[in-house]
Regions:
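Surface-exposed loop and membrane-interface regions of Gram-negative outer-membrane beta-barrel proteins
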Residues: 82-98, 112-161, 255-257, 447
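Outer-membrane beta-barrel "beta-signal"
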Residues: 453-465
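Residue-level signature of outer-membrane beta-barrel architecture
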Residues: 63-65, 78, 106-110, 166-169, ...
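Short loop/turn motifs that connect adjacent beta-strands in outer-membrane beta-barrel proteins
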Residues: 25-27, 55-72, 107-119, 170-173, ...
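Surface-exposed coil loops of outer-membrane beta-barrel proteins
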Residues: 132-164, 172-265, 398-408
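Outer membrane beta-barrel transmembrane domains
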Residues: 266-268, 284-318, 329-330, 334, ...
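Transmembrane beta-barrel strands of outer-membrane/channel proteins
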Residues: 72-80, 119-125, 176-182, 233-239, ...
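N-terminal periplasmic/intermembrane-space "pro-region" immediately following the signal or transit peptide
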Residues: 2, 21-79, 109-113
Length: 465
């Protein structure tokens, strides 16, 4: 059991991380944080409106499409990371990944008369299997806690992120969506994905390891109901499918591999309560009945690694997430310039989730310099605490093998907590080109204190077509 169950659970957890928090810059159009009134603006919070693309109106084709209700956003994103010092493996390496993404919607209201009816879709092409975190920064004998390149997906692949139908009821206060969907269409979208490190990219709900972000689809249906212009209740039912990130599922309509269902619930508040400036807050919980393997306990009550019946499983697990994103200052001549602060927290069921809790906080400043009003400065830090059950299992495996030397390749490191920090400055070279150099600091990569702290230099490039 020791050799069959544990690696499989860790592989699934690592795969969930790799396919999770990667929300491309090209999706950050403010759609997910739309203003409850015309006065609420999320620009200073990191959600900028669409900018003119490199290809302009495409010889008049784009305006024709938009006149017929078809809107799209085509973008390119690349992320380069270099281990400047420290880490598990000190050999220098520059790791590069990139992706093309197409996000689109077709307005159906004019054709059908159904209020706010639309077809929405997302297609993502990812390239290269270059992962600096896996190859240099952390001990490969433990699970991932962060990624230096948040858009790393584990493979070069083109896949469907979502394809859904949506409409509204009750004078647009109730929105319904159904189809092959992704959580980023409805849930945990109060913090943008601008940092290059994974734990500082967006919220924490993907750390549940039971659903996936951005370019992985799964069947479901959701509802959003506006209690007031600023307060929204959200809920849904989705399939829990560990096979969803696989290559065979990239364009599949099948539910093959599904283990149960997910029940996400969230409340989101948009307000001007602080300094009469825009802010957005959320609190969410995610339940699933899909069986999850315990990280330590066996069916008979003792350690699962030596239990003849293997590790026990749980058919009811949960994940809690919350956060806020609040503008704190503004320039007298431009409300969209100023300082904003953010915070996010994810708390998992540590019986089955090796990421017990994770939290991030930081600041953004849009237009720090008068000569560069559209540039961004960002500084953030995140902490990940590993599950006690996971650590107990690692200790027990070492006891079974009689290995106590960390340098023995068969030793199982016992992780505690990891800390990652990032500083970036984003230069808006043109309306369609942004360059974002950054510096990352990794303390106890993957939570292993024996691994040397690491410094990473980074460069993110965003092109809008």
């Amino acid at each position: 059991m020791m050799k069959s169950l544990l690696p499989r659970s860790m592989t699934l957890a690592a795969l969930a991380l790799l396919c999770s928090q990667a929300q491309a810059e090209t999706l950050q159009t403010g759609k997910e944080v739309e203003a409850p009134t015309a006065k609420w603006e999320g620009v200073a919070l990191g959600f900028e409106p669409p900018q003119p693309g490199l290809l302009g109106d495409m010889l008049g084709i784009r305006p024709i499409l938009e006149d017929h209700g078809f809107h799209y956003n085509l973008g390119y994103l690349s992320q380069l990371s270099y281990n400047a010092g420290g880490g598990y493996n000190h050999d220098k390496q520059a790791s590069y990944i990139d992706q093309f993404s197409l996000t689109f919607s077709q307005d159906l209201q004019a054709l059908t008369g159904i209020p706010d009816a639309a077809i929405e879709g997302n297609i993502v092409n990812r390239n290269h299997d270059n992962n600096l975190t896996r190859d240099r920064l952390q001990d490969p004998r433990v699970g991932l806690t962060d990624l230096s390149q948040e858009s790393f997906g584990g493979q070069s692949i083109t896949r469907l992120g979502w394809l859904t139908f949506s409409r509204s009821f009750l004078d647009s206060r109730l929105q319904w969506r159904i189809g092959m969907m992704n959580k980023v269409q409805d849930f945990d979208q109060i913090i943008p994905c601008d940092f290059q490190t994974l734990t500082l990219c967006g919220g924490k709900s993907a750390n549940s390891l039971t659903w996936y972000n951005w370019n992985v689809h799964y069947w479901g249906t959701t509802l959003q109901y506006k209690l007031t212009d600023g307060l929204t209740l959200k809920g849904g039912v989705m399939e829990q499918n560990p096979s969803a990130p696989s290559r065979s599922h990239a364009w599949s309509w099948s539910t093959k591999g599904s283990k149960g269902f997910l029940l996400p619930m969230e409340v989101e508040l948009k307000t001007h309560a602080v300094n009469q400036l825009p802010g957005v807050y959320n609190l969410g919980v995610l339940f699933t009945n899909a069986r999850q393997s315990d990280l330590y306990e066996g069916v008979s009550g003792g350690p699962g690694a030596s239990d003849p019946q293997g590790y026990r499983s749980h058919d009811r697990t949960w994940f809690l997430y919350t956060g806020f994103n609040q503008q704190m200052t503004r320039h007298a001549d431009d409300v969209n310039r100023g300082l904003s602060v953010f915070y996010s927290l994810g708390l998992g069921d540590q019986r089955s989730n090796y990421l017990h809790w994770s939290t991030s906080t930081g600041i953004r400043y849009r237009g720090l310099f008068d000569a560069r009003p559209d540039d961004w400065l960002g500084l953030g830090v995140s902490v990940v605490k590993l599950s006690d059950r996971y650590k107990d299992n690692q200790r027990y495996l070492n006891e079974m093998s009689g290995i106590s030397d960390y340098h023995d390749p068969n030793y199982r490191p016992v992780p505690g907590h990891s800390v990652t920090a990032e500083l970036y400055y984003r230069v808006k070279v043109t309306p369609w080109l942004q360059l974002q150099p950054g510096l990352q600091y990794w303390h106890h990569p993957a939570g292993v204190s024996e691994t040397q702290d690491a410094w990473v230099t980074a460069l993110k490039t965003v092109v809008t077509f």
